[in-house]
Amino acid sequence: MTRLVTPDITEDDLIESSLRPRALDDYIGQEKAKGNLRVFIDAARKRGEALDHVLLYGPPGLGKTTLANIIACEMGVNIKSTSGPVIERPGDLAAILTNLEPHDVLFIDEIHRLSHVVEEILYPAMEDYQLDIIIGQGPSARTIKLDLPKFTLVGATTRAGLLSSPLRDRFGVISRLEFYTDDELTTIVTRSARILNIGIEPEGGRELARRSRGTPRIANRLLRRVRDFAQVRADGVITAPVVDESLKLLEIDEKGFDHMDRTIMLTIIDKFGGGPVGLDTIAAAIGEERDTIEDVYEPFLIQHGFINRTPRGRVATRAAYEHFGRIAPPSSSQGNLF
């Protein structure tokens, strides 16, 4: 069963592409990144040039794909989208690059998952707008250079640290996307409700935003699920009590925690005395992949002060003990982390 509060894209999310803003003026939040992009886009348009290459990084579900599409719309060009795992061979990338028009945007999601061989092809394409193609094999092999139209590469990643330095250094614009505030998410929920013709009261929107883990993708997904409850049990209007009742039935608490979040936290607290405990040990204890815990679950728990990362492992904070109704051990036993 798919988690309702997963920040990753689900089939349900793909249906509601109408919720994506098409212009920077309609994009809510990320003011710093948005302000910088507006300046760079305006300058590129005035010069009649392609926008410099852009790297967007941050936790999943914060709008990296949406921003890539907005960049193309604001520049008045086409966008071609792909992802790192899909580009398996240099020939795959060459086929994409040679079909670009001048100033087009090439969006590569999960760019940190590009293979080293494919990256080598990308370097001259980004820097010199040239494609090096090797013809033949062995001593008779030769390299020919193909000129490419000047294009903009927009890369998106949740793990910027895994990008190689040569690739990262070729991006002229690097922006980190942050978790959204409750006020920003309330605005997003209200806008989405209007587009979907959902009746929602201000307090209902605020309560829904508060449980959305700082992530617009989750907010929009919860909005659709709560809408179902409202239509069946509350005359179709989303109020704060309707949000509370429906999310309780979906096992999402007032902090936005679901069953997996509680499993991780209670494993650290109950099985390992609050930590420190290694990530591999946690993964084995709950039957989940290490990378999934680190990339999907941990950012939210750390952001809200429920887990501390230490050289010796993960440690549950006093806030975590209080939230789950457990008695915290003396500070000294947790390395004075409280």
Curated annotation (Swiss-Prot):
<feature type="region of interest" description="Large ATPase domain (RuvB-L)">
    <location>
        <begin position="1"/>
        <end position="180"/>
    </location>
</feature>
<feature type="binding site">
    <location>
        <position position="20"/>
    </location>
    <ligand>
        <name>ATP</name>
    </ligand>
</feature>
<keyword id="KW-0233">DNA recombination</keyword>
<feature type="binding site">
    <location>
        <position position="180"/>
    </location>
    <ligand>
        <name>ATP</name>
    </ligand>
</feature>
<feature type="binding site">
    <location>
        <position position="170"/>
    </location>
    <ligand>
        <name>ATP</name>
    </ligand>
</feature>
<dbReference type="Pfam" id="PF17864">
    <property type="entry name" value="AAA_lid_4"/>
</dbReference>
<feature type="binding site">
    <location>
        <position position="217"/>
    </location>
    <ligand>
        <name>ATP</name>
    </ligand>
</feature>
<keyword id="KW-0238">DNA-binding</keyword>
<dbReference type="InterPro" id="IPR041445">
    <property type="entry name" value="AAA_lid_4"/>
</dbReference>
<dbReference type="GO" id="GO:0016887">
    <property type="term" value="F:ATP hydrolysis activity"/>
</dbReference>
<keyword id="KW-0227">DNA damage</keyword>
<keyword id="KW-0547">Nucleotide-binding</keyword>
<keyword id="KW-0963">Cytoplasm</keyword>
<feature type="region of interest" description="Small ATPAse domain (RuvB-S)">
    <location>
        <begin position="181"/>
        <end position="251"/>
    </location>
</feature>
<feature type="binding site">
    <location>
        <position position="290"/>
    </location>
    <ligand>
        <name>DNA</name>
    </ligand>
</feature>
<dbReference type="InterPro" id="IPR036388">
    <property type="entry name" value="WH-like_DNA-bd_sf"/>
</dbReference>
<comment type="function">
    <text>The RuvA-RuvB-RuvC complex processes Holliday junction (HJ) DNA during genetic recombination and DNA repair, while the RuvA-RuvB complex plays an important role in the rescue of blocked DNA replication forks via replication fork reversal (RFR). RuvA specifically binds to HJ cruciform DNA, conferring on it an open structure. The RuvB hexamer acts as an ATP-dependent pump, pulling dsDNA into and through the RuvAB complex. RuvB forms 2 homohexamers on either side of HJ DNA bound by 1 or 2 RuvA tetramers; 4 subunits per hexamer contact DNA at a time.</text>
</comment>
<dbReference type="InterPro" id="IPR008824">
    <property type="entry name" value="RuvB-like_N"/>
</dbReference>
<feature type="binding site">
    <location>
        <position position="61"/>
    </location>
    <ligand>
        <name>ATP</name>
    </ligand>
</feature>
<dbReference type="InterPro" id="IPR008823">
    <property type="entry name" value="RuvB_C"/>
</dbReference>
<feature type="binding site">
    <location>
        <position position="66"/>
    </location>
    <ligand>
        <name>ATP</name>
    </ligand>
</feature>
<dbReference type="GO" id="GO:0048476">
    <property type="term" value="C:Holliday junction resolvase complex"/>
</dbReference>
<feature type="binding site">
    <location>
        <position position="64"/>
    </location>
    <ligand>
        <name>ATP</name>
    </ligand>
</feature>
<dbReference type="GO" id="GO:0005524">
    <property type="term" value="F:ATP binding"/>
</dbReference>
<keyword id="KW-0234">DNA repair</keyword>
<keyword id="KW-0378">Hydrolase</keyword>
<feature type="binding site">
    <location>
        <position position="309"/>
    </location>
    <ligand>
        <name>DNA</name>
    </ligand>
</feature>
<dbReference type="InterPro" id="IPR027417">
    <property type="entry name" value="P-loop_NTPase"/>
</dbReference>
<feature type="binding site">
    <location>
        <position position="314"/>
    </location>
    <ligand>
        <name>DNA</name>
    </ligand>
</feature>
<feature type="binding site">
    <location>
        <position position="65"/>
    </location>
    <ligand>
        <name>Mg(2+)</name>
    </ligand>
</feature>
<dbReference type="GO" id="GO:0005737">
    <property type="term" value="C:cytoplasm"/>
</dbReference>
<keyword id="KW-0067">ATP-binding</keyword>
<feature type="binding site">
    <location>
        <position position="19"/>
    </location>
    <ligand>
        <name>ATP</name>
    </ligand>
</feature>
<protein>
    <recommendedName>
        <fullName>Holliday junction branch migration complex subunit RuvB</fullName>
        <ecNumber>3.6.4.-</ecNumber>
    </recommendedName>
</protein>
<dbReference type="InterPro" id="IPR004605">
    <property type="entry name" value="DNA_helicase_Holl-junc_RuvB"/>
</dbReference>
<comment type="similarity">
    <text>Belongs to the RuvB family.</text>
</comment>
<dbReference type="Pfam" id="PF05491">
    <property type="entry name" value="RuvB_C"/>
</dbReference>
<dbReference type="GO" id="GO:0009378">
    <property type="term" value="F:four-way junction helicase activity"/>
</dbReference>
<dbReference type="GO" id="GO:0000400">
    <property type="term" value="F:four-way junction DNA binding"/>
</dbReference>
<feature type="region of interest" description="Head domain (RuvB-H)">
    <location>
        <begin position="254"/>
        <end position="338"/>
    </location>
</feature>
<comment type="subunit">
    <text>Homohexamer. Forms an RuvA(8)-RuvB(12)-Holliday junction (HJ) complex. HJ DNA is sandwiched between 2 RuvA tetramers; dsDNA enters through RuvA and exits via RuvB. An RuvB hexamer assembles on each DNA strand where it exits the tetramer. Each RuvB hexamer is contacted by two RuvA subunits (via domain III) on 2 adjacent RuvB subunits; this complex drives branch migration. In the full resolvosome a probable DNA-RuvA(4)-RuvB(12)-RuvC(2) complex forms which resolves the HJ.</text>
</comment>
<dbReference type="Pfam" id="PF05496">
    <property type="entry name" value="RuvB_N"/>
</dbReference>
